[in-house]
Curated annotation (Swiss-Prot):
One of the GO biological process terms: molybdate ion transport
InterPro entries (UniProt xref): ABC_trnspt_W-bd_WtpA, ModA/WtpA
Protein name in the entry: Uncharacterized solute-binding protein MMP1652
Residues that span the membrane, as ranges: none
Length: 332
């Protein structure tokens, strides 16, 4: 290892069935990996509440939160691919509660245009990545949880595969990331405010959904991506061992051996199982409509399941949860 330091609420709360009223706007800021299920939830909700216009903005989860906390934008729903962003970045000033609704894992996606696609396995992917001409992609750790989780997966791979050069060869040698080894044997990746990559080896974009088209057209070979997104887009992929893929609750202690420091945000994030979280921001223009949308999501977990994302059932809630959804969650 090279070390460097540096269902519906009462209609009084959701008066959305009046055909004569001006349509309400229900704004959603959500993680890019939630585009497919939230597209389905949008259709479901608008069909039930015909006077509501659901408007979604997809971005990296960190960017979604910062729209509210730094750019003074408002939304009725904030849905993050990393539930911990809500308590760490929004509470108590911008949120009072959140629910954990679904989970995921990191896989490596590819196409038939990918070099050595017929050779890559869960055991040799990091060796394939080091071959001449092979190019791999991930989203920006500064903008997107999928991006910093991809870094964590590669760091955790060193112990899992018994090779202390994996992160060095794949990341340190091709980016300006750094790594600190702590006294307790854990590792902290340092993501600089401005990330530079060796474009001959690495393909990086702000969020994971921006990487899909270029992968499919052969701009690069392999992509660290959520399993649900790979399924939704019909991509081939290899699964990674449970002790590094961030998809297994029972490996939480193992995952915690890796962390990342986001320099531009002065924030350290410790690796943990991938869990999606939702809240209604405190400054939502129509708070009750937001709560009603969350209620609809909780009442229709099949939408997540059909999108390849295992649900957490019942959903786990933290904080001052609205009474309208209290019967649909367990308190965490």
């Amino acid at each position: 290892m090279i070390l460097a330091f540096s269902g519906c609420v009462d209609q009084s709360a959701s008066d959305s069935t009046s055909e004569d009223a001006t349509p309400k706007v229900l704004k959603i800021f959500h993680a890019g990996s939630l585009a497919v299920p939230f597209g389905e939830y949008e259709t479901l909700y608008e069909n039930e509440y015909t006077n509501v216009d659901v408007q979604r903005e997809s971005a990296g989860s960190v960017a979604c939160v910062r729209k509210i906390t730094e750019l003074n934008k408002t939304a009725e729903i904030l849905a993050s691919a990393d539930y911990t962003l809500i308590p760490s970045m929004m509470m108590p000033d911008y949120a009072d509660w959140y629910v954990m609704v679904a989970k995921n894992e990191i896989v490596i996606a590819y196409t038939e245009n990918s070099q050595y696609y017929d050779e890559i396995t869960s055991d040799n992917w990091y060796e394939i990545f080091q071959r001449d001409g092979v190019k791999y992609g991930f989203s920006s750790p500064n903008d997107d949880p999928c991006g910093y989780r991809s870094q964590m997966v590669v760091q955790l791979a060193e112990e899992a595969y018994g090779d202390s050069t994996i992160y060095d060869n794949l990341m340190l040698g091709n980016t300006n990331f750094e790594v600190n080894e702590n006294a307790d044997g854990t590792y902290c990746i340092v993501s600089p405010e401005s990330i530079d990559v060796n474009e001959a080896k690495v393909f990086m974009r702000s969020k994971e959904v921006d990487l899909l088209g270029p992968l499919e057209t052969g701009a690069y070979d392999y992509l660290f991506i959520y399993k649900s997104v790979a399924n939704q887009h019909g991509l081939s992929y290899i699964e990674l061992p449970e002790d590094i893929n961030l998809g297994d609750y029972q490996n939480a202690d193992e995952y915690a051996k890796a962390s990342i420091f986001l320099t531009g945000q002065n924030k350290t994030i410790v690796a943990k199982p991938i869990v999606y979280g939702m809240t209604v921001p405190s400054n939502a223009e129509d708070y009750e409509e937001g709560v009603n949308f969350v209620k609809t999501v909780l009442e229709h977990p099949e939408v997540f399941e059909n999108a390849g994302q295992p649900v957490i059932s019942p959903a786990i809630a933290v904080g001052d949860v609205p009474e309208e959804i209290s019967d649909l969650v367990v308190m965490g």
